[in-house]
Amino acid sequence: MRVIRSSIAGLAAWLLATQCVLAQPAATRPKVLAFFTVGGELDHLLFAQQAMRVFGARAADGGYAFAATSDWDVLNDSTLKDVRVVIWLNDMPRTAAQRQAFERYMTGGGAWLGFHISGFGTNAWPWFTEFLGGIRFSASNWPALPARVNVDDRAHSVVNGLPPTFVAPINEWYSWTPSPRTNPDVKVLLTLDSSNFPLGVKNTLNGGDIPVAWINSKFRMVYLNYGHGDRVYSTPILPAMIDNALRWLLNPSP
């Protein structure tokens, strides 16, 4: 419990500092707003905390203004009209009002970057099921483990500069039914390599087509199935992809 309190205290202090920075002229830059939840699984909170620090530190060089909130009621029309990109770090909206505001935002041309657990919304939100590619969560490995990942489309801006294959840090890898690849509107960017299987001990992924990152061309969105624990930023490859994804969402390009 001491670890959780420490993480929350550090996060609160950082958010206060971020709010002070955003009160300065950076507000003229396109706005990126991240949503997170304090609570739930600690590994998800640790990722959210680390990601917010990095987004905040890179905002000036990236040409955007960054803010974060744990108040999901901020996901409303009044706020979103001024936001270029919405990020879900370790949760998803729970109320009808929040979800409907997000639907209007995305169908109106907004942009979204979602990590890991945010994909669980497919099991209780029909619109989001279609948004993510017409899929539902199926299974995952446990414990969290590293895995070899292959780049599917090296020409896409989101994976620009990534090696064709690499070992990603420990993660709870999700599989989906059906595979997102079966949707003609989905472009898969990363996939688990078949050499990983069987993957897991208590819960095992035994094979199949398991995409790790993709876009749905009907929307301006990127889903990345990593965000479990604080190892994502321990190697340069995944952070580079996150930077690419945000850059692509801010500045549409092929």
Which residues does each predicted region cover?
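Bacterial N-terminal signal peptides
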Residues: 7-19
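Catalytic beta-strand/loop cores that center a nucleophilic Ser/Cys/Thr
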Residues: 138-218
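Helical hinge/lid and interdomain linker segments adjacent to catalytic or ligand-binding clefts
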Residues: 29-122
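A glycine-rich, often tryptophan-bearing local segment used as a flexible ligand/cofactor-contacting loop or short
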Residues: 88, 92-164
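Hydrophobic residues at beta-strand termini and immediately following loops
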Residues: 69, 189-191, 224
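Extracellular ligand-binding/catalytic regions of CAZymes and related secreted enzymes
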Residues: 24-36, 46, 54-57, 61, ...
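Positively charged n-region of N-terminal signal peptides that target proteins for export
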Residues: 1-5
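Generic alpha-helical structural context detector
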Residues: 9, 130-133, 243, 247
